[in-house]
Amino acid sequence: MTQTAKKSPFSMNVDLMHGPIFKNLLLFMLPIFISSLFQQLYNTVDTMIVGNVLGDTALAAIGSCGSIYELLVGFGLGIGNGLAIVAARSYGAQDHDLLKKTVAGSLVIGLVASLCITLAGVLGLHPLLLMLDTPAEILDDAYRYILTIDLGVLVMFAYNLCAGLLRAIGNSVMPLVFLLISSGLNVVLDLLFIARMGMGVQGAAVATVISQGVSVVLCILYIILRVKILLPEKKHFRVGSHLYWELFSQSISMGLMSSIVSAGSVVLQYGINGLGTLVIAGHTAARKLFSFTSMPVMAMASACSTFVSQNCGANQPERVRKGMKEIALYSVAVAVLAVLLMQLGAEWMVQLISGSNEPVVLENGARYLRWNAPFYAVLGVLLATRYALQSLGQKVLPLFSSVIELVGKVVFVLFFIPKFAYNAVILCEPIIWCFMAAYLVLVYLHDPFVFPKKAE
């Protein structure tokens, strides 16, 4: 008998393979959006408390190593997303024995990968901060912060893998519930470690790791007690070489894609670090706000990954085509709302996040937000198409979009930032997004599953 996920009053599995496409995508996406909101709140609460309690220098310390954090964690998160894609395909094909083998193989690959990432960070973080020309007055704080985050990569990866597996079977609600609980804990620990115990920026990192650890424990307990379909037995760990290769290649493809994107951020951070502490502080606050305001398109792209994976497993290319069109229209609507929001309150939001009254901080942060907002439509199409191609099993071609981004950022750092300063930083990503989106859409339109060639 086919085993199914056990229902509970606290769970909600959205059927992405049947029914109205956009409505079901929204139902599935909304918990992911709220989860992303509170996940981002981890770092933003750190930023607000650090900025208001410890000042601009401490805020710049966290901002100066933000791109390194993305590089370390991004690879692990990419691996988790790649593993969840294979699980969603198995679920879409209704092969639940294969699904359990996929979970077992994912645990093995994920553990090894996260330990390797942690070791690489321990060995290379300080030299990398020096290479990025991090200002001397913030170097020690930046190193303590990012080293603590690096030591907690396994915890962060474990949550994202568990949450990804639940979403692979259509359950995006329970990861949200656990994250809401841990987010409240994160705020309490931030205030305790930074404001009361005087642990400085390192206290913010410790609070983030501990609170995410709580969400991991809750997620694992839920899977054990309620979602037996994701609970492999001893026999399922005898994963065949073909499945291991599929898991490895899919996860490495996603991981490399995330790493190349993050490497581009590291390169760009090098250019920003040379513009001074106040510019770094303004950019840090603006990037935090960008992470919030772009979240609707990023959450939809994440939902698109599960949607395409399941329908690929169920052999429904027509449904994939319709879904991608509706996601593109949704991205345009988000961009319009973002433009209105930035015109009304960009400076106020930058001041709220940074706790600063410095004109340089507020002006640069506000300009970054206003100039980027119209391009959210391009970003939405870019992200959804990239996730869709990965979900369709294309492991190489989507990587080239990340290479385009990396090369573009190198060009801006070498030639444009020295001449145009922060204006070049602001325009860098929107211009690159346009090139990446054009390339990815072209690849998508030639995908043999979504657009099969008609027999002559």
Locate predicted features.
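Short alpha-helical transmembrane segments in multi-pass integral membrane proteins
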Residues: M1-M29, A87-L154, R196-I252, V308-F375, ...
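Residue-level signal for short hydrophobic patches within transmembrane helices
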Residues: H18, F22-L41, V45, I68-F75, ...
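Transmembrane helical elements of multi-pass membrane transporters/channels
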Residues: L27-D46, T148, Y159, S182, ...
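Transmembrane alpha-helix boundary and packing residues in multipass membrane permease domains
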Residues: I32, S36, M48, I85, ...
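Helix-terminus/linker motif at the lipid-water interface of multi-pass membrane proteins
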Residues: L37, L41-A60, L129-A136, L192-M199, ...
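Interfacial/gating helices of multi-pass transporter permease domains
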Residues: V50-E70, A136-D141, V201-A204, L243-Q250, ...
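Small-residue-rich hydrophobic transmembrane alpha-helices
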Residues: L59-L119, M156-P175, G282-A346, L379-G393, ...
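Short runs within selected transmembrane alpha-helices of multi-pass transporters and secretion channels
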Residues: G80, I149-R167, P175-N186, A204-V217, ...
